[in-house]
Amino acid sequence: MSRIGKMPIPLSNQAKIEIKDSNIRVSGPKGTLEQRLTDQVTVSEENGLVTVLRIDDSKKAKAQHGLYRMLISNMVDGVTKGFTRKLEIAGVGYRAELKNDLLALTLGYSHMIYFKAPDEIKIEVPDQVTVLVSGIDKALVGQVAAKIRSFRKPEPYRGKGIKYEGEVIRRKEGKAAGK
């Protein structure tokens, strides 16, 4: 049995879960998330614990078991606590600002880059070199953060670009001086 899949998911007092046929809905103080389940797993809730069981030991069912357990766990965490991804901008003249729900990025190009986030995602700019992406859907928060990072990925020679908080950029030496 999957090590991740067999662990029960504890429900907090704030989260409520509804299981109907092949759909699961988790609601909490921050919002509501829905997920369609595959026919390879079954979900049950009792005594504040959600358990995910697979229907057989086929390869596909084993693969889906841990996946759906983590998806449901992330849904519970999202509607109660939420998720945040912090991006750091490094480089001379590189900065970010918020203009009318648009993230305006100056990243060394000849033009500014404007990014409109989905409605479910909240973007904050506490200072010019920090961008906070937050929301209740972990996958969507990560996807939006990756999209913002893709506008100017960190480069290994000077370390300029947009990187995740705590991300380590392997630095390269560059060209050696003439001999």
Curated annotation (Swiss-Prot):
Any Gene Ontology biological process: cytoplasmic translation
Keyword flag Signal: no
Annotated TM spans: none
Record's keyword annotation contains Ribonucleoprotein: yes
One MF term in the entry's GO annotations: structural constituent of ribosome
Signal sequence bounds: none
InterPro entries from the UniProt entry: Ribosomal_uL6-like, Ribosomal_uL6-like_a/b-dom_sf, Ribosomal_uL6_a/b-dom, Ribosomal_uL6_bac-type
Pfam families (alphabetical): Ribosomal_L6
A GO cellular component annotation in the UniProt record: cytosolic large ribosomal subunit
Keywords: Ribonucleoprotein, Ribosomal protein, RNA-binding, rRNA-binding
Highest rank taxon of the organism: Bacteria
Gene3D superfamilies reported for this sequence: Ribosomal protein L6, alpha-beta domain
Listed NCBIfam families: L6_bact (TIGR03654)
Function: This protein binds to the 23S rRNA, and is important in its secondary structure. It is located near the subunit interface in the base of the L7/L12 stalk, and near the tRNA binding site of the peptidyltransferase center.
Subunit structure: Part of the 50S ribosomal subunit.
Family, similarity comment: Belongs to the universal ribosomal protein uL6 family.
Protein known as: Large ribosomal subunit protein uL6
Species assigned in the record: Pelodictyon phaeoclathratiforme (strain DSM 5477 / BU-1)
Taxonomic lineage: Bacteria, Pseudomonadati, Chlorobiota, Chlorobiia, Chlorobiales
